[in-house]
């Protein structure tokens, strides 16, 4: 069947998807559905999604556009937009992420600021800014009015003011962890002479946060470009060990904590990847390949196995890769290519995101995929799955229609989560838009972007 895309607010209707010939000869993602949760004129991007481990039919999805949110009570078949997440006392909010804790509370983490500093040299001339967390006690329907500051510069006139950027929130939901229920946030701090990674923790359901600590042994350059530190992401193992990765120049940096985030091992570079900022990707204003990390929670021979995924140019075009560790990150396997198109075909796969199913241990990776277009422009969404510990990946077509951007800003990331064979991905696609409100005189109208949630159900599959 043809993929029908329907937009409806505030209740957003399901987009039925029985994918026909998606991604040429790829098998269809089983039970695939795609739901739009934003309007083109909102130009949404940089989304995040989470599933409630206590009630897996509850899903929260958030996206950039002043920290907007939507919730679902039917396993992402439909979504309703939530109110009360946009911080009215700040000009801009973005870089959103979301998670549920082990009690079923939802959390929205975001960056808020009034103005940026010098372009790409954000700490130079920065205005007031900060990292904040907002809570929902009812699965994302309503959100507490007062957000809690993790770290903030509330006046913009503080001495030695820095710029806090790209926060990511995650929770310890491992049943046997001594720190179960704890929340963690990590982010980049741009300073005048360097970039570093900071980390904070909460042991009281996000009511208060610890004083941030630096977890990056090596500092990056102070510009938001190749050579800086970028792309913090963290996860928790079955014993409560925290694993964290980010891009450090042309490498992936890794560190871990065994005491609930109070202290971290010295960070070290583990995998050479090339620079994480990709230029000259047709139709997209910028693309980044920074890594993600996940852990197998189950027992057995793969219990506690740590996985990393990223994308880079080692084969000429952009490909997606994965590696794994069975010894808590001390040693790593050789990289495995996740996308299954021909090697050196000149067609890009980019903006990957990974999730490890905490129930089944299956590894999932989503990415934008251009394998069907010899011109390397038409873009679809592909979902890859590994059930053999990351040794091989089967690629599935998640969408059957492509989009072609005109230097669209899709953000710096997508997101993916999985629970008990059900997979939930979220991404942005560019679409034409007639709104010319934000168009400069003499230029064509800016294209819009729509945020989509894709679901797939691998129940009964091995």
Language model segments and positions:
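Positively charged n-region of N-terminal signal peptides that target proteins for export
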Residues: 1-6
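Bacterial N-terminal signal peptides
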Residues: 8-18
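Extracellular, repeat-based ectodomains that mediate carbohydrate processing or recognition
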Residues: 23-462
């Amino acid at each position: 069947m043809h993929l029908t895309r329907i937009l409806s607010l505030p209740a957003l209707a399901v987009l039925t998807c029985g994918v026909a010939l998606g991604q040429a000869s790829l098998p269809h993602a089983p039970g695939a559905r795609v739901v739009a949760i934003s309007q083109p004129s909102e130009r949404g991007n940089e989304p995040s999604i989470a599933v409630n481990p206590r009630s897996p039919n509850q899903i929260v999805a958030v996206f950039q556009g002043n920290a907007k949110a939507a919730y679902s009570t039917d396993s992402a078949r439909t979504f309703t937009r939530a109110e009360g997440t946009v911080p009215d006392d700040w000009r801009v909010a973005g870089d959103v992420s979301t998670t549920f804790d082990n009690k079923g509370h939802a959390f929205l983490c975001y960056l808020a600021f009034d103005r940026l500093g010098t372009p790409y040299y954000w700490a130079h001339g920065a205005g007031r800014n900060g990292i904040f967390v907002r809570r929902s006690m009812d699965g994302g329907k309503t959100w507490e009015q007062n957000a809690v500051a993790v770290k903030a510069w509330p006046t913009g006139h503080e001495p030695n003011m820095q710029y806090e950027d790209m926060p990511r929130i995650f929770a310890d939901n491992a049943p046997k962890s001594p720190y179960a229920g704890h929340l963690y946030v990590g982010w980049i701090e741009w300073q005048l002479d360097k970039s570093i990674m900071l980390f904070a923790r909460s042991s009281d359901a996000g009511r208060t946060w610890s004083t941030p600590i630096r977890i990056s042994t090596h500092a990056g350059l102070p510009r938001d470009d190749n050579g800086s530190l970028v792309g913090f992401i963290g996860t928790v193992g079955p014993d409560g060990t925290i694993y964290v990765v980010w891009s450090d120049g042309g490498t992936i940096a890794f560190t871990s904590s065994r005491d609930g985030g109070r202290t971290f091992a010295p960070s070290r570079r583990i995998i050479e990847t090339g620079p994480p900022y990709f230029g000259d990707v047709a139709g997209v204003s910028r693309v980044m390949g920074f890594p993600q990390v996940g852990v197998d929670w189950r027992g057995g021979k793969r219990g506690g196995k740590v996985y990393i995924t990223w994308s880079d140019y080692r084969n000429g075009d952009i490909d997606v890769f994965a590696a794994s560790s069975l010894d808590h990150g001390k040693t790593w396997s050789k990289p495995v290519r996740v996308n299954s198109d021909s090697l050196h075909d000149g067609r890009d796969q980019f903006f990957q995101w990974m999730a490890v199913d905490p129930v089944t241990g299956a590894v999932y990776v989503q990415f934008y995929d251009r394998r069907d277009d010899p011109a390397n422009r038409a873009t679809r969404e592909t979902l890859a799955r590994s059930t053999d510990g990351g040794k091989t990946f089967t690629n599935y077509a998640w969408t059957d229609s492509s989009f072609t951007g005109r230097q669209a800003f899709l953000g710096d990331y997508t997101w993916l989560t999985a629970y008990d064979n059900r997979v939930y991905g979220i991404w942005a696609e560019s679409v034409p838009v007639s709104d010319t409100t934000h168009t400069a005189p003499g230029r064509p109208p800016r294209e819009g972007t729509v945020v989509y949630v894709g679901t797939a159900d691998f129940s009964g599959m091995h």
